Amino acid sequence: MIKKLNIIFLTFFFYLFFVNFSQANFQEKLINKYKTINTLSFDFTQKIGEKVEFGNCYIKYPLLMKCEYPKKKKSIIANGKRFVIVKKKYKKIYHYSLKKTPLIYLLKKEIILNLIENSEPLNVDSNIIKYELIGNNSNKIKIFFDKNTLELLGWKTIDVYSNEVSFLFRNIETNILIKNEIFKIPKEEDL
């Protein structure tokens, strides 16, 4: 009886030890990989409620992002201070403070690194690692990484209208040359 208890205890101990060691090793690899990323280029699928849109996007850390939605003749630009939606079809530009959007957390690499370093993943399955970030306004942002390549795969959040918004990446390229000019906000008269 005592031998059985010892075997069960040892098995349980080794399981806990190796799971924690494996998790720490994984987090270290993810942190090291993410530290080396300065730019991202990718195609995306964005889903807001039942509405699905496609496009391509460029991110340059910190705080720069431009995404094009070709079918909608629309783009979004974050230039470090402002977040704008450019609707070329209507020749309109809508301005917002970047600080008031969830993108502020996603475009600061240090915030994501801090999240990985100081948090346990929300979920780990065979392909995806999911972390959850809670912003200052209690907005929850789920951030997805590929378990095998450790690439950032996208995020999911709730918008101001209580719609679930998912933004998923594919065809990801890292550390490509991206000129700062693409993040320049146009003037409405130039549309």
Where are the model-predicted features located?
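Cleaved targeting-peptide boundary
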Residues: S22-N32
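A short, Trp-centered hydrophobic/proline-enriched beta-strand micro-motif
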Residues: N32-V52
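Short hydrophobic/aromatic-rich beta-strand segments that constitute the beta-sheet cores
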Residues: F44, M65-Y69, F83-V86, Y131, ...
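An acidic-aromatic
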Residues: C57-Y105, V165
